[in-house]
């Protein structure tokens, strides 16, 4: 008999004389002649109550249906006389699929700390909080794809293994088949002659450059996949492996870029609020009581826009004593970003036209020769959510910028060649998907919105 998901059982329009459900026991309560099971299969936040009568075959195995055990139940879906749930299941048969020793099962009825749950990442999705977080993650991922499909973008798959550093920061994970290439290896490229690719290979930090290639043919594209940064940063906002959403648009400028970022963020938030109401409600009640109002505020108003120069002036005039003083030419720190989004504008704000010295070589040089057509979208509680720019389409300017930043133009011959044959204005951005999830849920640590976090000194699971 086909299994019915608990979500579908709870949303049934009529009783059912024969239903099959499977799931994990959350709790069991024994009474005279009956046992009451709370069962969850991950399809939704709400458990379904199962009544096991001592007169039925199901009662024979009820003693082993301890917290964490998995069971297969057949019975009747009937109206529940209790409050808070329309339906319950009266079990006729129950098969114990997997035992869970109550003495050693790591998830007990008490509320566990996030720090403890990170040590058992293989079991934490069974908790209410993390089950909800990962259902929201799945729905938000679907929303990203839906948004771009509805707006005429093509999804392209960019390489995970790369021979180039998009950001020019050098903080990349090396990939090699050589037995002893490490930090002490010679810097010359010849050391990699015997390697698999015959050259140095790393995990990608961004799919942007390859997405630009595809946009120069397909017009509007996006990539959505894992990226890797070998930054030794143990902060709540950084992970060594995370997912990036990276659209690229031909025949577009910085204005188009900022508008696309705003539209996408609002679309995903609206979609998740519509399709994950119960899961979001958990976070609104127990994680961040201001979450609902914050998300509604984001949807209700146009995002603010301010130049980097104006942002520095706002920070200086704020009277706030920042740990890092706001000075023109210095990058904005998280404390600056959050002040602008949370306290000054009280909503998301796009900061644009940054000094060229603090931005990457591919960002279009503005006419003033001092700034580039870059933008960062800052949001409350998070800081930077999106970073993007109009890309430099002029060959001579791009070559000069690469050399100015001490990089080798030969490494980007293919990227430069795009500017020789039908070059066109284009723009794009990158959004850290986990940071969007932090915004959606109110969760304060990136380790808790990705199933298996990769951070310095942590590579379990």
Swiss-Prot record:
Primary location class: cytoplasm
Record-linked Gene3D superfamilies: Bira Bifunctional Protein, Domain 2 (3.30.930.10), Nucleic acid-binding proteins (2.40.50.140)
Protein localization: Cytoplasm
InterPro entries: Aa-tRNA-synt_II, aa-tRNA-synth_II, aa-tRNA-synth_II/BPL/LPL, Asn-tRNA-ligase, Asp/Asn-tRNA-synth_IIb, NA-bd_OB-fold, NA-bd_OB_tRNA
One GO BP: asparaginyl-tRNA aminoacylation
Catalytic reaction annotation: tRNA(Asn) + L-asparagine + ATP = L-asparaginyl-tRNA(Asn) + AMP + diphosphate + H(+)
Pfam families membership: tRNA-synt_2, tRNA_anti-codon
Molecular function per GO: asparagine-tRNA ligase activity; ATP binding; nucleic acid binding
Gene Ontology CC annotations of this record: cytoplasm
Domain of life according to the entry: Bacteria
EC numbers for this chain: 6.1.1.22
Swiss-Prot/TrEMBL keywords: Aminoacyl-tRNA synthetase, ATP-binding, Cytoplasm, Ligase, Nucleotide-binding, Protein biosynthesis
Bilayer-spanning residue ranges: none
Binding partners and assembly: Homodimer.
Protein name: Asparagine--tRNA ligase
Top-level taxonomy: Bacteria, Pseudomonadati, Thermodesulfobacteriota, Desulfovibrionia, Desulfovibrionales
Gene that encodes the chain: asnS
